[in-house]
């Protein structure tokens, strides 16, 4: 027994070393590596085992990006990663970056059916510990990435390379009410919408597909829509489709004709068997909910007053009753009683001006036409409601003027007076009056500097000051209409110089057709010069309305814009937008290398090192990086 005890004793410690390899095998789990997955818009970090397959890596990525695994294409070193391969086979180590391309749903359906059959046998032979480690690793970093999508939903306004216009203070309820009221006025007055679309500024912007695509793609709501429906990105990245869409948008008559053809096609459905039932279901399921939503938001059906004068509730028939009456024509002009405009062609020349009677008569004629035109615009309910909103909500104006975007635009215009003058002179209100152009041109730099003055912004946020400016504006309108000969050099603006600082901030929100930018004015007869906001009681005030003590130097705007660092891509976008708006003709397209600089850098980072081939692919696809990648991969030898 002793021998047995002695003999049995040594094996016990000998089992310790023998059990060491068995005990070391469970701790020898695969190494967890951190791999960065980068898309053209965002970047995420994943922690996965190093021996994971590409298919398992895609499953972890699909949960984060909310896409199907067959839509994901992983690219590393210029090669597409196959599902059955492992990360170690491609040399993917800790800290490296893998590029991700998300395909649309309708394209990869043919490939998605063949890949699982080939990868099923290989993926099942991999270790089972990786499947449990990968989700645990991804969930640890999920809360960090979940904070990024929520910031894009904070504001529905996006512009250019700006993330959003949330810094403008546009999330306040006051701006939402103002926006809804503006939309209601545009629906109730199609003429105002036509004037906006025919404005040279808007025409120049719509003639640049790249600028419009940049504006659309920068909108957070459009980004979410494209992520949910990737096929829309191909429409936006197709320059031909964008050009056709913008051509239709610039031509309201063409848009109305297309809508009319659509209505005619729908009305012809009644002659087809079963077509009436389809129309009834469409009106019941689609039209009525849309009209109810429009009535809740805008307060009424905009097409209700076109067909009949009855209320919206009286003319509605039950859904099961057959409607024999023809549909009203929504494009028929409303029966409005227009008052005859008193246009006096004969002008009375003053006794003091004996020279140039013919030139004074033509100038007075232009003055009367411009005065009546601008007065008619400012007498519309939309403009009156807009001005009332401005006076009731001075905080809205202060938020807009103190926003980095507004200050950056003012700085860009003040640094380039010629560009600002070109923007102003391209308005139809000034193109027909060269004398007025010469008066406005030298005053633009002072006006732009005054708009950056903090005292001007503070004065505009004062409700009493705004009411006083409104009274001056209304009085000058009356003078310009009733006695245009008293202030001939002032009448075309109808007092907008004095109220310039109060109404100019509304320009970026609602451009009202041919009014154009608002500038200060010079002499008003014997009253003397009136500046935009110069205090009347301040001694030593100059003729331009800028007190000598508060003259803003050229370096002042740069100090106010420094906190938000607007000199980066935002400043470049603003300059590009201003250049696009100022051009009388569509701007010339830039060099393709400059135009697709960002896409070339992304392709180079993905491993596509042939710059010439990348550039040709981007030119052929119109800058669509996904289509360019597919084109480059299709041209590579298999």
Curated annotation (Swiss-Prot):
- Entry annotated with the keyword Transmembrane helix: no
Cite the STI1 domain residue spans from the record: 189-217, 219-258, 393-440, 444-476
**What processes in GO biological process is this protein linked to?**
autophagy; ERAD pathway; negative regulation of clathrin-dependent endocytosis; negative regulation of G protein-coupled receptor internalization; positive regulation of ERAD pathway; regulation of autophagosome assembly; regulation of macroautophagy
Region 11 X 3 AA tandem repeats P-X-X: start-end pairs: 505-537
Q: Which GO terms describe its cellular component?
A: autophagosome; cytoplasm; cytoplasmic vesicle; cytosol; nucleus; plasma membrane
> Sites of the modification Phosphoserine?
25
Citing just one GO molecular function, the answer is: molecular condensate scaffold activity
In the UniProt record, does the keyword Repeat occur? yes
Q: What keywords sit in the KW lines?
A: Acetylation, Autophagy, Cytoplasm, Cytoplasmic vesicle, Membrane, Nucleus, Phosphoprotein, Repeat
Residues annotated as domain UBA: 589-635
The places in or outside the cell where this protein is found are:
Cytoplasm; Nucleus; Membrane; Cytoplasmic vesicle, Autophagosome
The cross-references to Gene3D superfamilies, in alphabetical order and at most eight, read: 1.10.260.100, DNA helicase RuvA subunit, C-terminal domain, Phosphatidylinositol 3-kinase Catalytic Subunit, Chain A, domain 1
Changes after translation: Degraded during macroautophagy.
Expression across tissues: Highly expressed in smooth muscle. Expression in other tissues is very low.
Assembly, in brief, is: Homodimer. Forms heterodimer with UBQLN1. Binds UBE3A and BTRC. Interacts with the 19S proteasome subunit. Interacts with C9orf72. Binds CD47. Interacts with HNRNPA1 and HNRNPU. Found in a complex with UBQLN1 and MAP1LC3A/B/C. Interacts with EPS15, EPN1 and EPN2. Interacts with HERPUD1. Interacts with RAD23A. Interacts with TARDBP. Interacts (via C-terminus) with FAF2 (via N-terminus). Interacts with UBQLN4.
Q: What does this protein do?
A: Plays an important role in the regulation of different protein degradation mechanisms and pathways including ubiquitin-proteasome system (UPS), autophagy and the endoplasmic reticulum-associated protein degradation (ERAD) pathway. Mediates the proteasomal targeting of misfolded or accumulated proteins for degradation by binding (via UBA domain) to their polyubiquitin chains and by interacting (via ubiquitin-like domain) with the subunits of the proteasome.
Name of the protein: Ubiquilin-2
Give the lineage. Answer: Eukaryota, Metazoa, Chordata, Craniata, Vertebrata
Q: What gene name does this entry carry?
A: Ubqln2
């Amino acid at each position: 027994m002793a021998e047995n005890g002695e003999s049995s004793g040594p094996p016990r410690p000998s089992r310790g070393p023998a059990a060491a390899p068995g005990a070391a095998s469970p701790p020898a789990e695969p190494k967890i590596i951190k791999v960065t997955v980068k898309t053209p818009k965002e970047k995420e970090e994943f922690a996965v085992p190093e021996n994971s397959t590409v298919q398992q890596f895609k499953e972890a990525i699909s949960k984060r990006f909310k896409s199907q695994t067959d839509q994901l294409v992983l690219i590393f070193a210029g090669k597409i990663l196959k599902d059955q391969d492992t990360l170690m086979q491609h040399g993917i180590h800790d800290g490296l970056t893998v590029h991700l391309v998300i395909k649309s749903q309708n394209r990869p359906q043919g490939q998605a059916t063949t890949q699982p059959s080939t990868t099923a046998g290989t993926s099942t032979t991999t270790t089972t510990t990786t499947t449990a480690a990968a989700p645990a690793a991804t969930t640890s970093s999920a809360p960090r990435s979940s904070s990024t999508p929520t910031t894009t939903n904070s504001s529905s306004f996006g512009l250019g390379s700006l993330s959003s216009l949330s810094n403008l203070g546009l999330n306040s309820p006051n701006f939402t009410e103002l926006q809804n009221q503006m939309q209601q006025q545009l629906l109730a007055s199609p003429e105002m919408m036509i004037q906006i679309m025919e404005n040279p500024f808007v025409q120049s912007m719509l003639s640049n597909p790249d600028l419009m695509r940049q504006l659309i793609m920068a909108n957070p709501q459009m980004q979410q829509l494209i992520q949910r429906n990737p096929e829309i990105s191909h429409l936006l990245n197709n320059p031909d489709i964008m050009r056709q869409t913008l051509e239709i948008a610039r031509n309201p008559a063409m848009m109305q004709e297309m809508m009319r053809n659509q209505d005619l096609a729908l009305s012809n459905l009644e002659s087809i068997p079963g077509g009436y039932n389809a129309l009834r279901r469409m009106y019941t399921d689609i039209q009525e909910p849309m009209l109810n939503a429009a009535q809740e938001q805008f307060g009424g059906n905009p097409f209700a007053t076109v067909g009949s004068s009855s209320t919206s509730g009286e003319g509605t028939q039950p859904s099961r009753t057959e409607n024999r009456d023809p549909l009203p024509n929504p494009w028929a002009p409303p029966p409005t009683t227009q008052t005859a405009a008193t246009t006096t062609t004969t002008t009375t020349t003053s006794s003091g001006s004996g020279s140039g009677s013919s030139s004074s008569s033509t100038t007075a004629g232009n003055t009367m036409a411009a005065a009546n035109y601008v007065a008619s615009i400012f007498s519309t309910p939309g403009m009156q409601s807009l001005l009332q909103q401005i006076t009731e909500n001075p905080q809205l104006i202060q938020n807009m003027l103190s926003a980095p975007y507004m200050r950056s635009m003012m700085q860009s215009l003040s640094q380039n007076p010629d560009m600002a003058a070109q923007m102003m002179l391209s308005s139809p209100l000034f193109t027909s009056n060269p004398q007025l152009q010469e008066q406005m041109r030298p005053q633009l730099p002072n006006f732009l500097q005054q708009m950056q003055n903090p005292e001007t912004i503070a004065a505009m946020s004062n409700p009493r000051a705004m009411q006083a400016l409104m009274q001056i504006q209304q009085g000058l309108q009356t003078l310009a209409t009733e006695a245009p000969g008293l202030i001939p050099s002032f009448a075309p603006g109808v007092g907008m110089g004095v109220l310039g600082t109060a109404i100019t901030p509304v320009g970026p929100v609602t451009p009202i057709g041919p009014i154009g930018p608002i500038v200060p004015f010079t002499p008003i007869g014997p009253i003397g010069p009136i500046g935009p906001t110069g205090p009347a009681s301040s001694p030593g005030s100059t003729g331009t309305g800028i007190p000598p003590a508060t003259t803003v130097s050229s370096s002042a705007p740069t100090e106010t814009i420094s906190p938000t660092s607007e000199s980066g891509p935002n400043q470049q976008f603003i300059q590009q937008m201003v250049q696009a708006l100022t051009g009388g003709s569509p701007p010339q397209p830039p060099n393709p290398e400059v135009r697709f600089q960002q896409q070339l850098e992304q392709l180079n980072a993905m491993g596509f090192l042939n710059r010439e081939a990348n550039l040709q692919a981007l030119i052929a696809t119109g800058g669509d990086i996904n289509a360019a990648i597919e084109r480059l991969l299709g041209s590579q030898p298999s």
